[in-house]
Amino acid sequence: IRREENLSIRKFFWIVMAEVIRLTSNDRTSTFKLHARSPEEIQNRNVSALNCFKIVSKRNIKDIASYISVLEEKELIKNGKYIKNAEVKWADTSIKIKSKKKFNLLVTSPPYGENQTTVTYGQFSYLPLQWIPINDIDSTISIDYLKSTQEIDTQSLGGTKKLNIEE
């Protein structure tokens, strides 16, 4: 993947690889949290990461082709390119949005609160993110989010509570 020069193609294959890691690792797929399979289950598993990579790649290519067909039907593709603007920004939810731009959609982590048993998207993402170079994701973000399996969830909920201390 790293030898591919085209960033869009690399990103496609990083997505494939992320799913392959989830499907073939020794982590249980029955939960979003990182829980190792039992030693017996690990010993008895017969999975091929390479075969899984091929299957997921082919499925995702088919899905993209189907999506492109829908965009073409709606005349949103011209000369092989999407004609609308889409901009994605990485932001910190604890800091005020400083922009004069208008936006149609703001996506945030769901408000799943302080409960330690809630869905942990960070743990779900942690293993695949160990493989993907930060510059292929977004060069403006810090890799501090990988310092522990809980850090992504902490950051996506606005970090830790800050006390107002008067000097």
What does each model-identified segment do?
Residues 1-164:
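Nucleic-acid modification enzymes, centered on SAM-dependent nucleic-acid methyltransferases
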